[in-house]
């Protein structure tokens, strides 16, 4: 049985850890509130951009454009959004599993790692990291998203990669986040988004022609999807960390309660033993 000193030392250590996890939970809660407000504010624009492109492709017939068909290269670019820090439950590992447990061939992937944890995990598994941008997850901005998208799109138009994918975490609510993998290029028509009968009477004209219109709008469309995913991932990270720290704080509280009970029992046993020895000594003197 552990001594009173050991129990007290362990209780003190767990209490210190509990204070840290509680503080981290509060920090994540504040960050989550800001990120959630940002995500909700920008979501309508990105959804509208997505529906616009889907509708445009559905009503334009069979357009011929490089953005609409896979390139000749067998290589695939995957932009992977993870966090720079751990202590977020399965947030990072769930994203990495989309890559490692999917249908991709490791030797055909070019990884653009946004977030240090994703880079670490994928590097350890032997994946080729083309670019690393951990700073982007600290304070996501549209300008940074546009700059990275420009480089990834150049790899596509130059024929270095034939397809572009995005792995991110979709923010459903505070307690639910979903790891998702979507294809950015070539653009694929979403039948559910394109089959909107209420928009069928809208007449679309492209100036000077549909191909040149796509040349301008597709990069903005891809950047919009990427930035939207970046904002959602940032919110999801803080939601996942808040849950993890809440669980850790609760577990620490249970352990402290259990150790307090053990300490009191040990103390009671020690007092009882001392009284017994005193009584026995008194009886011996008599």
Language-model segments: residues:
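C-terminal beta-strand-loop-alpha-helix "lid" module of Rossmann-like NAD(P)-dependent dehydrogenases
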Residues: 1-286
């Amino acid at each position: 049985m552990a001594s009173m000193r050991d129990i007290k030392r362990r209780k003190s250590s767990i209490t210190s850890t509990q204070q840290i996890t509680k503080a981290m939970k509060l920090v994540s809660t504040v960050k989550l509130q800001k990120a959630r407000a940002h995500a909700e504010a920008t979501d309508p624009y990105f959804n509208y951009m997505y529906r616009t492109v889907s509708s445009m492709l559905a009503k334009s017939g069979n357009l011929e454009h490089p953005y609409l068909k896979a390139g000749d290269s067998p290589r695939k670019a995957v932009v992977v959004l993870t966090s720079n820090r751990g202590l977020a439950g399965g947030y990072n590992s769930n994203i990495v599993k989309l890559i490692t447990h999917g249908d991709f061939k490791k030797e055909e992937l070019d990884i653009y790692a946004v977030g240090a944890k994703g880079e670490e995990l994928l590097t350890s598994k032997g994946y080729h990291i083309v670019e690393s941008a951990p700073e982007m997850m600290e304070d996501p901005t549209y300008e940074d998203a546009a700059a990275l998208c420009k480089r990834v799109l150049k790899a596509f138009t130059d024929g270095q990669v034939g397809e572009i994918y995005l792995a991110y975490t979709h923010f459903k609510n505070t307690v639910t986040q979903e790891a998702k993998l979507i294809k950015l290029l070539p653009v694929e028509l979403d039948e559910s988004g394109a089959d909107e009968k209420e928009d069928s009477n809208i007449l679309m004209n492209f100036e000077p022609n549909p191909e040149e219109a796509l040349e301008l709008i597709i990069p903005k469309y891809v950047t919009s999807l990427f930035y939207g995913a970046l904002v959602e991932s940032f919110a999801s990270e803080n939601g996942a960390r808040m849950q993890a720290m809440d669980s850790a704080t609760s577990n620490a509280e249970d352990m402290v309660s259990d150790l307090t009970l053990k300490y009191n029992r040990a103390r009671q046993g020690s007092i009882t033993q001392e009284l017994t020895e005193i009584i026995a000594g008194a009886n011996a003197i008599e």
